[in-house]
């Protein structure tokens, strides 16, 4: 097989599929983040009843992102989506300090789930465009993220509204998917 045919084969190779679970409390900005990733209009977003799925191409991967509603009544159903998850993205509203304890509890429970064991987790500290937003370092400390030892994790400041920090987070996702998939 010549070099040219090898290159053709590589070029035609389909992108590797990655299953990403996008979770967080209601109003954290999950759907806005997903639409930002898909370069879609973010001016009219309503609370997610159930789930949204979008596929996004990034760095040779086809990222299949499952955005699951975060309302309290929907959260018990999150576990129905855990199977075969490659990466967990957890979104936090950095400006809603009254809910830090609640979001921390939900994240802690997710990290205890057997079907999510060893799954890398990216925590987006969202809404950094708001003056009242807590910095990612303060959130990381408050959630005791430094105690996570059984998986790769990253906290990333972002604004789903402006797009700032979103690509940095997705670069981390792609890097950790390639490490996991090898």
From Swiss-Prot:
It is found in: Golgi apparatus membrane; Cytoplasm, Cytoskeleton, Spindle; Nucleus; Cytoplasm, Cytoskeleton, Microtubule organizing center, Centrosome. Gene3D superfamilies: P-loop containing nucleotide triphosphate hydrolases. Small GTP-binding protein which cycles between an inactive GDP-bound and an active GTP-bound form, and the rate of cycling is regulated by guanine nucleotide exchange factors (GEF) and GTPase-activating proteins (GAP). Required for normal cytokinesis and cilia signaling. Requires assistance from GTPase-activating proteins (GAPs) like RP2 and PDE6D, in order to cycle between inactive GDP-bound and active GTP-bound forms. Required for targeting proteins to the cilium, including myristoylated NPHP3 and prenylated INPP5E. The lineage of its organism: Eukaryota, Metazoa, Chordata, Craniata, Vertebrata. Belongs to the small GTPase superfamily. Arf family. Mg(2+) binds at residues 31, 48. It is a peripheral membrane protein. Found in a complex with ARL3, RP2 and UNC119 (or UNC119B); RP2 induces hydrolysis of GTP ARL3 in the complex, leading to the release of UNC119 (or UNC119B). Interacts with RP2; interaction is direct and stimulated with the activated GTP-bound form of ARL3. Interacts with SYS1. Interacts with ARL2BP; the GTP-bound form interacts with ARL2BP. Microtubule-associated protein. Does not interact with TBCC. Interacts with RP2. Interacts with PDE6D; the interaction occurs specifically with the GTP-bound form of ARL3. Its main location: Golgi. It comes from Bos taurus (Bovine). Keywords: Cell cycle, Cell division, Cell projection, Cytoplasm, Cytoskeleton, Golgi apparatus, GTP-binding, Lipoprotein, Magnesium, Membrane, Metal-binding, Myristate, Nucleotide-binding, Nucleus, Phosphoprotein, Protein transport, Transport. Signal peptide: none annotated. This is ADP-ribosylation factor-like protein 3. A lipid is attached at residue 2 (N-myristoyl glycine). GO terms for cellular component: centrosome; cilium; cytoplasm; cytoplasmic microtubule; Golgi apparatus; Golgi membrane; microtubule cytoskeleton; midbody. GTP binds at residues 24-31, 48, 67-71, 126-129, 159-161. InterPro entries: ARL2/3, P-loop_NTPase, Small_GTP-bd, Small_GTPase_ARF/SAR. Pfam families: Arf. GO terms for biological process: cilium assembly; Golgi to plasma membrane transport; kidney development; mitotic cytokinesis; photoreceptor cell development; protein localization to ciliary membrane; protein transport; small GTPase-mediated signal transduction. GO terms for molecular function: GDP binding; GTP binding; GTPase activity; metal ion binding; microtubule binding. The modification Phosphoserine is found at residue 5.
